[in-house]
Amino acid sequence: APSMTTPEPASKRRVVLGEISNNSSAVSGNEDLLCREFEVPKCVAQKKRKRGVKEDVGVDFGEKFDDPQMCSAYVSDVYEYLKQMEMETKRRPMMNYIEQVQKDVTSNMRGVLVDWLVEVSLEYKLLPETLYLAISYVDRYLSVNVLNRQKLQLLGVSSFLIASKYEEIKPKNVADFVDITDNTYSQQEVVKMEADLLKTLKFEMGSPTVKTFLGFIRAVQENPDVPKLKFEFLANYLAELSLLDYGCLEFVPSLIAASVTFLARFTIRPNVNPWSIALQKCSGYKSKDLKECVLLLHDLQMGRRGGSLSAVRDKYKKHKFKCVSTLSPAPEIPESIFNDV
């Protein structure tokens, strides 16, 4: 796909979440974000959760998995175990918690929070795994606890605090996360929310994320005509876009990772079928299983969803990420590419 190379965006002052307001196009609707005058969204019928294909197509990684921490003989077993783990109710957020549980928090507010957390992860140079895990904590907590919008940022930084302890070699301390909120909250408030989070999640802090499954699927992603680094950055970009959209909670992480791979390959080589037998075997998903998620991700990529949430897009405009957010994807995805390979 052609690349529109643009100069790196000028550095901007990090925005404290409380300063963001009236961002009506963040995800959908015309809500005034983080303002007091707001109508509670009407409940909608719960959609059926996408559980992935039930057909056992087998997982075949062969000898291509080059992670020195993983013995290739056990990669398939580990992948299957993680897929079972992602289906456990205790590790999954409700896909419609905004409508069913929350009274004051909206999907737009969630999008603004996630966008801000991406900025925080960049400023503190946190691992991508920390970002994914923190956002999963936010969604799981909000699935069972009603939260006032004034506490949403507190939940975000407390989730980051726990996730950084879980993933980082040198995790940030409480004072760092208080500082990142411009002292909106005290250290005592952050620690109290941390304790509440741990109690709510019953100390089940380890969960497979989209980032987890991307590592497995990339192991069998073969395309000699595409620079490996460019593909990886594009896949990471699309995966982080999925974090912004509340609608992606409908899909399990392994399906999102497979859809990200599908869309990244289509973006780079739109005239070639993006799926293959090898990818189908390793992911456990056929092309048709990915269709709904791929189309949602494509809308995010095109800016038709979450267009005003800029942190992820700005991050991947940088030359060190090969400017992958400036790639021009096809405006529409043909139905034919979802046919079986």
Swiss-Prot record:
SUPFAM superfamilies: Cyclin-like (SSF47954). PROSITE patterns: CYCLINS. It holds the Pfam family Cyclin_C. One of its GO terms (biological process) is cell division. Keywords: Cell cycle, Cell division, Cyclin, Mitosis. CDD domains: CYCLIN_AtCycA-like_rpt2. SMART domains: CYCLIN, Cyclin_C. InterPro entries: Cyclin, Cyclin-like_dom, Cyclin-like_sf, Cyclin_C-dom, Cyclin_N, Cyclins_cyclin-box. PANTHER family: CYCLINS (PTHR10177). This is G2/mitotic-specific cyclin C13-1.
